[in-house]
Regions:
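Periplasmic alpha-helical coiled-coil/stalk elements that build and connect Gram-negative outer-membrane
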Residues: 13, 37, 122-237, 244, ...
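Short segments within alpha-helical structural elements
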Residues: 184-212, 356-413
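Sec/SRP-type N-terminal targeting helices
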Residues: 26-30, 43-44, 98-126, 176, ...
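Surface-exposed, polar helix/loop patches in the mature regions of secreted/periplasmic/lumenal proteins
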Residues: 80-148
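Small/polar, glycine/serine/threonine/aspartate-rich low-complexity segments that form flexible
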Residues: 53-93, 264-297
Length: 413
């Protein structure tokens, strides 16, 4: 169910409503939550890493006393069995990172920049929503103007039809002339019905797109395009976000080359323990533990470092190229739009005069018909010429406004 229509929806209102109604807008909140959860998970890398372990093994061989020592112990009355081949261990290990070389910070930076890239790409899509609104909005305005002109044309034809009917009854005009202009009026009314159907359909489509009931769009005022600000365009912001992501990935790559320092503690209950000699003499479970510090350096990261850096450099080059392509196409688009605006303004400069002249010619034809100097075909020709002139005047105005507001989008103003 769409909200109730308000009188005179403006272009800005429709654009804002369309953005808020577009399903993709919901992803803004979802993206923010996803990024926040990812950052929270990465930050947990500073928490102690705890692992529990249960182990049971049977070995093919174990540490044993030399045979000479076993003989000596036997002579002394001692039974030295040595270690058993079945061994058991229940343990827990705790490790705490002290210095990770900047990996966690780098991962958080990459996650943040990835979130910004996703948001920037979505902003580009939402910016295109405004262009789609422009297309429908100005098409609706043009249909509205055509309906008004058809109504005016119907009134003119109806007035002349009435005159010809009267003249036909008096015998000063033929019945065929009356029927011809009546048929023309009915044809125009059919066209009006078709235009009204198109108008209703486009209203419904724009209403569904914006999420509000659009029935009476107002003609926007002619605006002057401000100087272009390309760096603020969503496409440029998306490219900047991708470049920052590439920089963050490069920093993370460097961080993976740094040594890492951690402290750890390990404890287990089982057999054998750390006191090997005691366990060789007595087969019993014992509690054992140790603490320490560990410095590690993953030299294996060197294997792919060169290729990884080259890949990031290529990504940056591709992004820069995309920026250049966008700026090139955007400049061409602005050039075309400015030329079209200038063309429509030049045409509009003489539209009023053409309409006035066509109106004068049409009125003269009506007078000639009343005095029997011309026929109805000449009159209908002049009526249509006047209507075409008025239609062209409306088209020039609406198309110029559309080009102005499309240029406003192109220049991000």
């Amino acid at each position: 169910m769409l909200p109730a229509a308000v009188c005179g929806q403006t272009l800005d209102e429709c654009q804002v409503a369309a953005e808020q109604n577009y399903p993709l807008i919901k992803q803004y909140g979802l993206m923010a939550q996803t990024t926040e959860m990812t950052l929270s998970n990465i930050q947990k890398g500073w928490l102690p890493q705890i692992s529990a372990m249960v182990q049971a093994t049977y070995q093919s061989d174990v540490t044993a006393w030399p045979s000479q020592m076993q003989s000596m112990y036997s002579q002394m009355g001692l039974q030295m069995e040595g270690l058993r081949k079945d061994q058991y261990r229940l343990g827990i290990d705790v490790a705490q990172t002290v210095y990770d070389g900047g990996i966690i910070r780098g991962q958080k930076d990459v996650s943040r920049e990835q979130g910004r890239v996703d948001e920037a790409r979505m902003a580009v899509t939402l910016y295109d929503v405004r262009r789609r609104v422009n297309e429908m909005y100005f098409s609706l305005l043009l249909l509205g103007e055509q309906l008004k002109l058809n109504e005016d044309l119907t009134r003119v034809l109806a007035a002349n039809e009435k005159k010809l009917e009267s003249m036909s009854l008096r015998g000063t005009a033929s019945e065929a002339d009356y029927k011809a202009i009546r048929a023309e009026r009915l044809t125009v009314e059919q066209q009006t019905e078709s235009l009204q159907s198109q108008h209703r359909t486009l209203c419904d489509v724009l209403s569904a797109f914006c999420g509000i009931a659009v029935s009476a769009p107002t003609k926007p005022a002619a605006c002057e395009a401000l100087p272009a600000v390309p760096e603020l365009h969503p496409e440029m912001k998306a490219a900047d976000a991708q470049l920052r992501l590439a920089d963050a990935q490069k920093r993370l790559l460097d961080a993976r080359m740094m040594p890492k320092l951690s402290v750890f503690a390990s404890a287990f209950y089982g057999y054998p323990g750390y006191n090997m000699f005691d366990d060789m003499m007595r087969h019993r479970w014992s509690l054992n533990g140790m603490i320490g510090a560990r410095l590690t350096w993953n030299i294996g990261a060197l294997y792919t470092r060169k290729a990884d850096r080259a890949k990031i450099a290529l990504q940056r080059s591709m992004i820069e190229n995309m920026r250049e392509v966008f700026l090139f196409n955007n400049r061409l688009q602005q050039l075309r739009q400015n030329r079209n605006i200038a063309r429509y303004r030049k045409l509009m400069a003489t539209d009023d005069e053409i309409v006035n002249l066509r109106q004068s010619v049409r009125k003269a034809a009506e007078s000639k018909l009343a005095h029997g100097i011309t026929d109805v075909n000449d009159l209908m020709k002049e009526i249509h010429s006047e209507n075409v002139a008025r239609l062209q005047q409306s088209i020039h105005e609406i198309e110029m406004l559309k080009e102005l507001y499309d240029l406003k989008l192109s220049t991000n103003n």
